[in-house]
Amino acid sequence: ATQPDFAARKDLDWTPREIIPENKKMFAALRRTEIEWRLDRKTSLETVAEEMSPLDSVCTIVNLRRHARQIADALYQSCPKNTVFFLTTDLCPAHRSRQIEIIRQRLHEGKPCRVVATQCIEAGVDLDFKTVYRALAPLDAIIQAAGRCNRNGCDQMGRVIVFCPEDSRRLYPDDWYNNAAVTVQEMSPPFSIHDPDNIREYYQRLFDGSTDKKTLTEAIDARSFAQTAAQYKLIDNTGVQIIVPYAEKRELYKSI
């Protein structure tokens, strides 16, 4: 996982220590991808689908489910349906796991595989694509997406394209995600995501711009309970749990 620059946090009462000497050389030696920054213009979702169509090992990761649906729908029109896979939290966990197993098997066998997904594919999913498209996102999310490209370190470098989706409506799930993505833009790409100095700069900018977090931290440090209460806000739990009678669990659902 991408580690934040903890050394930049002056409010911490501990100092991290680098355990790998000359880690910059390690980053360079382990580089498996080339990053193409396409942020000087907006890219339509239809264009992304068109570019994915002729590729046989490609994954596009976007920030919103409706963007994933648009790209997948376009691919269904231009590619054999059994080569297109759609992964979002609209699918129940069991369904997603089954789809991931099918994708992994197809990739292993060298069969065409075009995947459109949201962030649910970025962590804990061991898939390896030749090409990955990533909608502009926080830097750690871009690095996670790049981890799905040339994961096995083949001779040829993997290709990661970071693009800004064309959409008149919101582009990100929430304000924090938006601010973190804007921070990436403010660093004036192109730059290497494999350089620890760039990762450090990103987190420094993010920490410096997080005024709400600073205010809350200062209130806690000052033991100002009234100010802490005013600043602190729990994440709203607006989700509703549902039962999905999927696959072999369908009979169990009926029996209940």
Sequence positions of predicted segments:
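A short helix-to-beta-strand connector/capping loop
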Residues: 30-33, 80-83, 111-112
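Conserved two-lobed SF2 helicase motor
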Residues: 106-122, 134
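C-terminal helicase lobe and adjacent C-terminal extensions/tails of nucleic-acid helicase motors
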Residues: 46-55, 61, 66, 70-97, ...
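A short beta-strand-to-loop transition that corresponds to the Sensor-1 phosphate-sensing loop
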Residues: 1-3, 62-65, 117-120, 136
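Flexible, active-site-adjacent loop/turn segments at secondary-structure boundaries
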Residues: 28, 33, 89, 119, ...
